[in-house]
Amino acid sequence: MELKPRGYEKVQQLIHKGVSVPNPLTLDIGEEVDIERVSGDRVTIYPGCRIYGANTVVASGAQLGYEGPVTIDNCQIGPKVELKGGYFKEAVFLEGANMGLAAHVREGCILEEQAGGAHCVGLKQTILFPFVTLGSLINFCDCLMAGGTSRKNHSEVGSSYIHFNFTPSGDKTTPSLIGDVPRGVML
């Protein structure tokens, strides 16, 4: 009996186009994933990663799973993005965005250029403008946060922060605006 992992042919196609896959037999790639949407230029997919979704895109220089397994489901991953470990569903990561080990990024999130978080960060329906930095052990949902103009001039949320948007009676949730968004960050 010959054992082959699901998506074995797709893994072979990735390797053939130049993707670095240190341990090919540990990857799980869904049948719906379009290999043409995964760049072969300087992309590394480390052991234990799972890639699902017909809308998944992985651009050049992306690094997936360096610190632990990554599950991606219908995400758009821009150039030089580092998703070091965790679960990522229906989210967008622009150039240089990054998330540490044990991240949980759910639907509706956008991490713009060089925005990112350390380990154990949970996001849902959150937009981080360029250069926003999130510390470790954070739950940061339903937020729009302005970032800054560079890595030196940026916005940061410290570690062990929880942001829930419920009224005291628990009957309603509302989004939060953090930073100087109304005065021109969106322009």
What are these regions (language model features)?
Residues 1-185:
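Domain-scale signature associated with acetyltransferase and cell-envelope carbohydrate enzymes
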